[in-house]
Curated annotation (Swiss-Prot):
Source lineage: Bacteria, Pseudomonadati, Pseudomonadota, Alphaproteobacteria, Rickettsiales
Function in brief: Involved in the regulation of the intracellular balance of NAD and NADP, and is a key enzyme in the biosynthesis of NADP. Catalyzes specifically the phosphorylation on 2'-hydroxyl of the adenosine moiety of NAD to yield NADP.
Subcellular localization, as worded in the UniProt entry: Cytoplasm
Record's keyword annotation contains Nucleus: no
Coarse class of the protein's main subcellular location: cytoplasm
Descriptive protein name: NAD kinase
Keyword Transferase applies: yes
Gene (name only): nadK
């Protein structure tokens, strides 16, 4: 991938400003809107926030890890930065579209790259009904919550909640309960990326529920609809010897 214009995005309060300044001295950079590649310096959180902010530009993102985990990032190598981008592989991610309705009847929409999650707002467990493609699949799930994860997000919150890791090209979604109380032995479901999942919240007054799309949170929700978007996509760049597919496979074997 040949590039001439790069943009740099980083947290100006980062403790790694010395490294960031070194990168700025080594490479010419331009305004974000003029870039051929947007380089996000930091961790997964910094990357996700800026993907949400700039995905409408349809410019590829390259994450440079200065955080802790950095699952969606590339290892720091200031000297070979442009070479690594030239030789990088592209992963195409389709975000989830979440539509929620709250107790006032207000409807909100948000995109999620990793997962959509719904969870109890108080000490009372949540109760909700689950429909898939308009068909009731579970009349009542009693749990702390539930989530729908993309393949890219399946190794994040979904994995911590006991859900499976999905291969990036699987065209599937994870539906995973969070601390399920009833049915106690239900561990979730694997669904097609073309499926539409709907959660109807039960006993809302006593058991209020919130919903999030990645880091965007909505309060006092009555229903949530989740589906994958095909008309929106994100291009993430990864070093040729450090692809997202390889990382997902390694994660399944505990590497």
């Amino acid at each position: 991938m040949n590039i001439n214009k790069i943009a740099l995005i980083y947290n100006k309060n980062s403790k790694h400003l010395a490294i960031i300044e070194e990168i700025k001295k080594l490479y010419n950079y331009c305004k974000i809107e003029e870039a051929e590649v947007i380089i996000i310096i930091g961790g997964d959180g910094e990357l996700l926030h800026n993907i949400h902010r700039y995905m409408h530009l349809n410019i590829p993102f390259y994450g440079l890890n200065l955080g802790s985990l950095g699952f969606l990032m590339n290892p720091l190598d200031t000297k070979k930065l442009l070479q690594n981008i030239y030789e990088s592989t592209v992963s195409i991610l389709h975000p989830l579209l979440m539509q929620v309705e709250d107790t006032s009847g207000q409807i909100y929409k948000a995109l999620a790259i990793n997962e959509v999650s719904i969870f109890r707002k108080t000490n009372q467990v949540a109760k909700f009904r689950i429909d898939v493609n308009g068909v009731e699949r579970m009349s009542e799930l009693v749990a702390d919550g539930a989530l729908v994860a993309t393949p890219a997000g399946s190794s994040a919150y979904n994995l911590s909640a006991g859900g499976p890791i999905l291969p990036l090209a699987s065209n599937m979604l994870c539906l995973t309960p969070i601390c399920s109380f009833r049915p106690r032995r239900w561990h979730g479901a694997l669904l097609l990326s073309t499926d539409t999942i709907k959660f109807e919240i039960l006993n809302i007054t006593k058991r209020p529920v919130n919903a999030t799309a990645d880091f965007q949170e909505f309060n006092n929700i009555t229903r949530v609809t989740v589906k994958s978007t095909k008309d929106k996509y994100i291009k993430l760049l990864f070093n040729k010897n450090h692809t997202l597919e390889d990382r997902i496979i390694k994660e399944q074997f505990g590497e």
